[in-house]
Amino acid sequence: SRGLGDVYKRQIVVNSGIANSCTGIQGEKDAFKMQQLAANKLQIQQEYVGVASTGVIGKMMPMSILENGFSKLVKNGNADDFAKAILTTDTHTKTCVVNEVFGNDTVTMAGVAKGSGMIHPNLATMLAFITCDANISSQTLQQALKDVVEVTFNQITVDGDTSTNDMVLVMSNGCTNNNEIKKDSEDYYKFKQMLLYIMTDLAKSIARDGEGASKLIEVTVKGAKESSAARMIAKSVVGSSLVKTAIFGEDPNWGRIIASAGYAKTNFDINQVDIFIGRIPVLIRSSPIKYDKEEIQEIMSAEEISIELDLHQGNYEGQAWGCDLSYDYVKINALYTT
């Protein structure tokens, strides 16, 4: 909503179950009311509170229930309770923590996320909140987030459907005694590696927990002319419904892989592509390779499937993550309430 994101935040209040999207003027008023209730409870200025909602589109917020919930807020609650409270169709929580030494102090970074269906950023029914205690300016933190989100959350897809609601938020309270992390310094790149670790882990957790999913798919594209092209092709492959159903059926159908790479909106020489499923080559310079069926069947039966394409066009690479497409995905979304 307007006015909820124009200053830096100190706290975030989240509700799940109702997206508060397409709810008109009343929905906007309800968002500001949530902000006010949280600010009063936490005894901070209202503009320092961020608001996020996830759930069914078009339903009004049950404000009486929410107001009662705010009366039970605690400042030092259990992080696991928060991770559970923000879920919708997710089957499990998604959290990650990492520590790194900067000078004479240790910086801690922690992340929590939700997301299972309507996942195809940029825009997805996903939320991710990352907190740390590093001494870093808001501007530098924003730049790090912008860089890392491109190769993590923006590289996942569950079903190709975007959504009305998503948010990735990084906050730092600056409580450690490390020297301020400056952009382009050695500490900045170390900090970005921490952020990359957290956000990659959370992104893969969302992909792994895709609605009805039984397998995580990781696609790596190497030998591209540009990193953006590699990422585009990787996401095209992992987002293909035919690739996803082949993975669900444990069928090493490389034809679907090369086809989905080919319709990515970038150019490459289709006659120079290598494809590996797991460690097994199935296509070399765009010619099929005989492989041991029992060996590849063992790979296809695993819960994590890796697919690698080498374009032999350059030195850049990119990755994307998704999941298989099962009968349960149809069941879940056929029965999901409106």
Residue ranges and their predicted role:
Residues M232, G239, V243-T338:
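Internal helix-turn-beta structural module
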